[in-house]
Each structure stands twice: as C-alpha cells, then as structure tokens.
C-alpha cells in the first residue's frame, strides 16, 4: 500500500543552499538512506555534490528557477470557487496543466509526476496558500515520484486526493492478482475497473469519460 506524505498547509520557504534541507521541508518523513545516495541524472539538473546529503542547490537551475515559477504561479492562482465545472482532459494532459487547473480554481485535485524531488515546480507549489501535495514514489521506478496536488480550501480537495490513492492501490492490487496475464492485458483490465471513477475525481467532462471507457473496451476486445 502507498503511504504518501501529506502537506496539510503551505510550506514556509527556507533560505538555504543545502539540497537536503529543501527536500525535508516538503517531505519530512523521507528515509535517511535517500541522502546517502549519489544524485541521479535528474537530480543533477538542480543540485551538485557527491551525495544528496552534502549536495548544494544550483543557483540558476533551482533557486532562481523556483523563484520564477513561484512568481508565475502566484499570477495564475485563484481562490477556491463555490462550485467546480468539468474540465477537458486536454487541459490537464501535461504536468503543468495538471497543477495549473488546480491552483487556478478549475478543479479541486490533480496529479502529475516529477523525476526529482528537487523539481522547482514542486517546491513552488508547496508554498502557495491552500495548495497541498501528497507525494509518494512510483513503484518499480527508481526516479519518478507521484504528486497529488489539491485545494485545502475545498472539502473536495483532500477527499478526492485520498480517493485517488485508494484507486491507485486498487489498480496495483488487481495487476498483482493478474500476474499470470500478459502485461498489456493486465494494464487494460485494471484500467477498466478504476477509469470511470478516476475520470470523475479528476473533474473530466462526462462525454470524455464515456469516450475513454469506449476506447478501453475496444482495446480489451482486440487483446482478448
């Protein structure tokens, strides 16, 4: 089961050159062994050092870039509306689109991935008011972290974030139960079970959810 770390409120920025401190600021329960490892290829875009524990932040690539991204996010930020309208799946088809639709008040929750915990967008997001993140490593992947971003000023925010994690775990369990099946068949069968509700908690348009379910059903019929 996934045990994500939750930021229940906006994280206060810290003035430091040490890479370890900024990660612990948004991910306080991360395992200490993480900092004994050498930075991976994606970390090296933002930090320099023999290990993550002694690494320092790169001024331009992390410090300045995070400041630029935070400034941009503040201009796009909006207070939570009284009600949310469905959005097109295309609006949230990129990492930026996913979090932008949340901070601009279009939907209460979104999800994206980062290839490094030093990603400037992730740190900038965590400092916005009423924007929270649940972070956990993607299984069977040495680099990716899944970020569930949600509005803390809407009751739907954390409710849907928690449900996303439940559905994510359900899909993983189904794929493990189908370990005798071909990988593509496992992926499609598990997707069929969670796809409709997943689309609903992401606030996608009903017609687009229906179209996606039809696509999944057609794909399954071709595989079986």
UniProtKB/Swiss-Prot annotation:
Q: Which InterPro entries match?
A: NleE/OspZ (IPR048901)
UniProt-annotated stretches for the region Interaction with host proteins TAB2, TAB3 and ZRANB3: 49-52
| Gene Ontology cellular component annotations, sorted alphabetically | extracellular region; host cell nucleus
The reactions it catalyses are: L-cysteinyl-[protein] + S-adenosyl-L-methionine = S-methyl-L-cysteinyl-[protein] + S-adenosyl-L-homocysteine + H(+)
Q: Where does S-adenosyl-L-methionine bind?
A: 92, 98, 107, 111, 204, 208
State the superkingdom.
Bacteria
Q: Which Pfam families match?
A: NleE
Which keywords does this Swiss-Prot/TrEMBL entry list?
Host nucleus, Methyltransferase, S-adenosyl-L-methionine, Secreted, Toxin, Transferase, Virulence
Molecular-function GO term, any one: protein-cysteine methyltransferase activity
List localization entries.
Answer: Secreted; Host nucleus
The EC number(s) attached to this protein equal 2.1.1.-
Report the main location listed first in the record: secreted
The UniProt record lists the keyword Nucleus: no
- Gene Ontology biological-process entries: methylation; symbiont-mediated suppression of host NF-kappaB cascade
What does this protein's UniProt record list under function?
Cysteine methyltransferase effector that inhibits host cell NF-kappa-B activation by preventing nuclear translocation of host protein RELA/p65. Acts by mediating cysteine methylation of host proteins TAB2 and TAB3: methylation of a conserved cysteine residue of the RanBP2-type zinc finger (NZF) of TAB2 and TAB3 disrupts zinc-binding, thereby inactivating the ubiquitin chain-binding activity of TAB2 and TAB3, leading to NF-kappa-B inactivation. Also mediates cysteine methylation of host protein ZRANB3, inactivating its ability to bind ubiquitin chains.
SUBUNIT field: Monomer.
Similarity section: Belongs to the NleE/OspZ family.
**Stated name of the protein:** Cysteine S-methyltransferase NleE
Q: Which organism is it from?
A: Escherichia coli O127:H6 (strain E2348/69 / EPEC)
Q: Which gene encodes it?
A: nleE
